[in-house]
Amino acid sequence: GVGREGMGTTCTAAMLEGERLVIAQVGDSRAYLLHQGKLQQLTRDHSLMADMIEAGQLTPEEARSHPNRSVITRALGSDPHTQPDLYETNVETGDRLLICSDGLSGMIFDDQIENTLRRVQDPQRCASQLVNEAIAAGGHDNVTVIVADVTGYAEVRRKKMARKTKLTVALVLVLLAALVGG
């Protein structure tokens, strides 16, 4: 439509099969894994700030207040040939997956995210708490958060179809939230 040229959205999707977690990501929505109580960022933002940090031109702290902090370098819809980055890792029972928009990761620091993921046991309540923390920090963007716990392999097999359906619905909601908020 008119005025939509160059517009796009971000997307981070996860697929868990057994102990193997595969992440597909375009844009600056992130995936994190809480493994043995330590938070690790699984994805790299497709953003001007990430490029500048990697090049040593900015610190992560400087990037948070930079006037171009919202500029993304890759998005769905902006180029028909856009390809996602793929990440693969193994997970264990007890790990916790977090997928979030930049409305979370741009407002609160990773140590606060890690603390909340460890402290709030219920995944839905944890996601709500993270959203509330981002808003309390002055959230100026949409805040979308999904928290999922890794359970035993036998349980994953039994619930495979139900989880795929729920994950698909959740990912569609993330995409819609990014479209509406962006």
Where are these regions (language model features)?
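PP2C/PPM-type serine/threonine phosphatase catalytic domain
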Residues: 1-182
